[in-house]
UniProtKB/Swiss-Prot annotation:
Protein name: Nucleoid-associated protein CKL_3826
Function noted in UniProt: Binds to DNA and alters its conformation. May be involved in regulation of gene expression, nucleoid organization and DNA protection.
Gene Ontology CC annotations of this record: bacterial nucleoid; cytosol
Subunit record text: Homodimer.
Amino acid sequence: MARGGFPNFGGGGNMNNLMKQAQKFQKQMEDMQSELENKEFSATAGGEAITVVVNGKKQIVSIKIKPEVVDPEDVEMLEDLVLTACNQALKSAEDQTASEMKKLTGGLNIPGMF
Protein backbone atom coordinates (compact mmCIF):
# COMPACT_ATOMS: atom_id res chain seq x y z
CA MET A 1 0.00 0.00 0.00
CA ALA A 2 1.20 3.49 -0.76
CA ARG A 3 2.40 5.72 2.04
CA GLY A 4 -0.37 7.55 3.77
CA GLY A 5 -2.14 4.59 5.33
CA PHE A 6 -5.85 4.25 5.74
CA PRO A 7 -8.12 7.28 5.74
CA ASN A 8 -9.49 8.16 9.17
CA PHE A 9 -7.00 5.84 10.89
CA GLY A 10 -4.15 8.18 11.69
CA GLY A 11 -2.34 8.12 8.33
CA GLY A 12 1.32 7.42 7.76
CA GLY A 13 0.89 3.69 8.02
CA ASN A 14 1.84 3.85 11.69
CA MET A 15 0.56 0.64 13.29
CA ASN A 16 0.46 2.21 16.77
CA ASN A 17 -1.82 4.97 15.53
CA LEU A 18 -4.01 2.41 13.81
CA MET A 19 -4.30 0.37 17.01
CA LYS A 20 -5.10 3.48 19.06
CA GLN A 21 -7.80 4.47 16.59
CA ALA A 22 -9.25 0.94 16.67
CA GLN A 23 -9.31 0.94 20.48
CA LYS A 24 -10.94 4.37 20.52
CA PHE A 25 -13.56 3.19 18.04
CA GLN A 26 -14.22 0.06 20.11
CA LYS A 27 -14.69 2.16 23.27
CA GLN A 28 -17.07 4.50 21.45
CA MET A 29 -19.05 1.49 20.20
CA GLU A 30 -19.29 0.02 23.70
CA ASP A 31 -20.39 3.36 25.16
CA MET A 32 -23.01 3.85 22.46
CA GLN A 33 -24.32 0.30 22.86
CA SER A 34 -24.62 0.73 26.63
CA GLU A 35 -26.40 4.05 26.21
CA LEU A 36 -28.84 2.62 23.66
CA GLU A 37 -29.56 -0.45 25.79
CA ASN A 38 -30.71 1.82 28.61
CA LYS A 39 -33.02 3.91 26.41
CA GLU A 40 -36.71 3.20 26.09
CA PHE A 41 -38.79 3.59 22.94
CA SER A 42 -42.56 3.67 22.84
CA ALA A 43 -45.27 3.44 20.22
CA THR A 44 -49.04 3.59 20.27
CA ALA A 45 -51.83 2.13 18.17
CA GLY A 46 -55.57 2.59 17.96
CA GLY A 47 -55.52 6.26 18.88
CA GLU A 48 -53.29 5.61 21.90
CA ALA A 49 -55.52 2.77 23.08
CA ILE A 50 -52.42 0.55 23.16
CA THR A 51 -48.98 1.72 24.28
CA VAL A 52 -45.90 -0.49 24.02
CA VAL A 53 -42.49 0.35 25.48
CA VAL A 54 -39.31 -1.47 24.44
CA ASN A 55 -35.71 -0.98 25.51
CA GLY A 56 -32.59 -0.69 23.39
CA LYS A 57 -32.04 -4.43 23.74
CA LYS A 58 -35.29 -4.77 21.77
CA GLN A 59 -37.10 -6.32 24.72
CA ILE A 60 -40.68 -5.37 25.49
CA VAL A 61 -40.74 -3.49 28.80
CA SER A 62 -44.46 -2.81 29.08
CA ILE A 63 -47.78 -3.00 27.29
CA LYS A 64 -50.64 -0.74 28.37
CA ILE A 65 -54.16 -1.39 27.11
CA LYS A 66 -57.01 1.02 27.77
CA PRO A 67 -59.99 -0.95 29.12
CA GLU A 68 -62.40 0.54 26.60
CA VAL A 69 -60.67 -1.26 23.69
CA VAL A 70 -61.12 -4.67 25.23
CA ASP A 71 -64.08 -6.14 23.37
CA PRO A 72 -64.61 -9.86 23.98
CA GLU A 73 -66.52 -9.95 20.70
CA ASP A 74 -63.52 -8.63 18.73
CA VAL A 75 -60.33 -10.08 20.21
CA GLU A 76 -58.71 -10.06 16.76
CA MET A 77 -58.79 -6.25 16.62
CA LEU A 78 -57.05 -6.05 20.00
CA GLU A 79 -54.42 -8.54 18.85
CA ASP A 80 -53.80 -6.46 15.71
CA LEU A 81 -53.43 -3.26 17.74
CA VAL A 82 -50.96 -4.87 20.15
CA LEU A 83 -48.97 -6.33 17.26
CA THR A 84 -48.88 -2.98 15.46
CA ALA A 85 -47.71 -1.09 18.55
CA CYS A 86 -45.04 -3.72 19.31
CA ASN A 87 -43.67 -3.61 15.78
CA GLN A 88 -43.63 0.20 15.73
CA ALA A 89 -41.79 0.39 19.06
CA LEU A 90 -39.21 -2.17 17.92
CA LYS A 91 -38.75 -0.29 14.64
CA SER A 92 -38.18 2.91 16.58
CA ALA A 93 -35.44 1.20 18.61
CA GLU A 94 -33.86 -0.22 15.45
CA ASP A 95 -33.99 3.13 13.65
CA GLN A 96 -32.36 4.93 16.58
CA THR A 97 -29.64 2.28 16.79
CA ALA A 98 -28.97 2.55 13.05
CA SER A 99 -28.87 6.34 13.25
CA GLU A 100 -26.35 6.29 16.11
CA MET A 101 -24.24 3.68 14.29
CA LYS A 102 -24.22 5.82 11.16
CA LYS A 103 -22.94 8.79 13.17
CA LEU A 104 -20.19 6.70 14.73
CA THR A 105 -19.06 4.96 11.54
CA GLY A 106 -19.50 7.93 9.23
CA GLY A 107 -22.09 6.00 7.24
CA LEU A 108 -19.88 2.95 6.75
CA ASN A 109 -22.03 -0.18 6.95
CA ILE A 110 -20.26 -2.72 9.15
CA PRO A 111 -22.21 -6.02 9.14
CA GLY A 112 -23.00 -7.62 12.47
CA MET A 113 -22.38 -4.54 14.60
CA PHE A 114 -25.95 -4.37 15.97
